[in-house]
């Protein structure tokens, strides 16, 4: 049934769909592109401290950034046959007000594009997402890095204050030592 929606003719290459498996040569090309794109991001963004690769066989990159609210944020990228997955650790499991904290991040998921909060190992809070390889380009990779970084920077202390009794006091102490 046609419902009147039309997509741009070039929104995806004619031979490529989200469900396509990329062969070894295509993955090698994408791997090289990601290396190049992350290298350029490293030189153009002062807060990116390091871009590293996994020592193992998997296609995995680490982007470490200095923050203002959270001292460091590291984003892990993992290349699969269909998608590039990404995640960053936000905070450990809450010691108190877990229900309120989980509600806060679930409600925040509604406002995020290309990422979502999730619960990981030991109930820690992560920010995760994935993008189809057919849609991956340098602009999208930069958007992903910016989205994860800015979301962590914006919500790190508010989430800690919900989940930890001493967080507000620590934040005040931290801010007072920065102004001295």
Locate each region found by the language model.
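Short, internal acidic amphipathic alpha-helical interface segments
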Residues: 85-126
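A short beta-strand motif that forms the metal-chelation/ATP-contact edge
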Residues: 62-63, 126-129
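Short, highly charged C-terminal tails/helix-capping segments
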Residues: 160-180
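The feature represents the first ordered module of a protein
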Residues: 65-99
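Generic alpha-helical secondary structure signal
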Residues: 25-28, 32, 96-100, 139
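Charge-rich, low-complexity N-terminal segments
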Residues: 1-72, 120
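A generic structural motif
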Residues: 90-94, 131-137
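Ampiphathic alpha-helical segments that act as solvent-exposed interaction surfaces
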Residues: 100-112, 133-164
């Amino acid at each position: 049934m046609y419902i009147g929606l039309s997509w741009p003719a070039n929104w995806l290459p004619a031979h490529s769909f989200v469900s396509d498996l990329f062969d070894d040569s295509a993955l090698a090309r994408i791997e090289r592109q990601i290396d190049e794109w992350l290298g350029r991001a490293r030189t153009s963004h002062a807060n990116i401290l390091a871009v590293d690769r996994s020592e193992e066989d998997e296609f995995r990159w680490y982007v470490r950034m200095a923050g203002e609210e959270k001292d460091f944020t590291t984003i892990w990228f993992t290349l699969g046959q269909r998608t590039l997955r990404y995640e960053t650790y936000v905070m450990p499991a809450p010691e108190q007000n877990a229900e309120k904290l989980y509600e806060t991040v679930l409600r925040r998921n509604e406002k995020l594009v290309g990422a979502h909060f999730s619960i990981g190992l030991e109930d820690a809070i992560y920010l995760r997402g994935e993008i189809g390889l057919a849609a991956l380009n340098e602009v999208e990779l930069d958007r992903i890095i910016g989205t994860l970084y800015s979301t962590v920077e914006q919500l790190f202390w508010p989430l800690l204050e919900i989940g930890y009794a001493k967080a507000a006091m620590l934040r005040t102490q931290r801010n007072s030592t920065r102004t001295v």
